[in-house]
Amino acid sequence: MSDAEALAGFIGKWRERWPEWRVAEVFVPAQARAASVAWFALQQELVEAAWGGSDPRPGEAKLGWWAEELQGWSQGRRRHPLGIVLQRVPAPWLMLAASLPVLAASREASGSRGQARAALAPIAQAITGIDAVVFDGPARSDDAGEVLLAMQLLLLGDAAAPLQVRARTGDGIAEEGVARAWAADLSLEWTATNDGPRPLRIRSALLRERLRRFAAGDPRMRPVPPLTTLWVAWRAARG
């Protein structure tokens, strides 16, 4: 398999998880599309390693591998196909590598929303630093933190909800009821903003819409329908 084929495979895997992007990326400048999907695909690889599956050990090993890979990117070396696009970007890859142990440790539920956000703050700050370089403009660490909380919820379901939310919903709640309550909290408190790079605004808007629909009863991983995606992405792109 060639490097180009391997890269296309990882990008394709991300697109399978986020089919909305085929509609939404029409609002992303053409010159930013390749870097956008590669960077989003890398983040998906990291969060799935941290929060995917029932056994955390394979994911911890994968995050350890990624820490070494990102250190290599800062020194001009790469092994992973996503590095074909991303390694040449002069972003703070070392900062992201250093934050991966925090991501690995974030599988356990936090006590409250504030604690959940604080637990992910180092990885959110690292992502924000890379966002600013990839998208050539200032990004917001609070928005990166909300993205991480949303991804954690979509991957872990009930297990992602802080203990405070579980106590509020009580015993005997329907399956994924705790997760739906947490999704409602996140979607209501995550305020859309007009600043930040356009690809990030669009992705955040789609995540908020997924959360809103899940809170209202949709399956947790169901994509946003195409017509709704078009409307949501257009509004986010306008700023």
Where are these regions (language model features)?
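Long, charge-dense
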Residues: 90-93
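Acidic/His metal-coordination segments adjacent to aromatic residues that form catalytic metal sites
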Residues: 101-113
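Short pre-active-site segment immediately N-terminal to the catalytic Zn-binding motif
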Residues: 114, 137-142
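Conserved active-site beta-strand-loop modules that form the wall/rim of enzyme catalytic pockets
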Residues: 152-154
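Catalytic cores of Mg2+-dependent Asp-rich isoprenoid enzymes
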Residues: 1-68, 72-85, 96-101, 120-129, ...
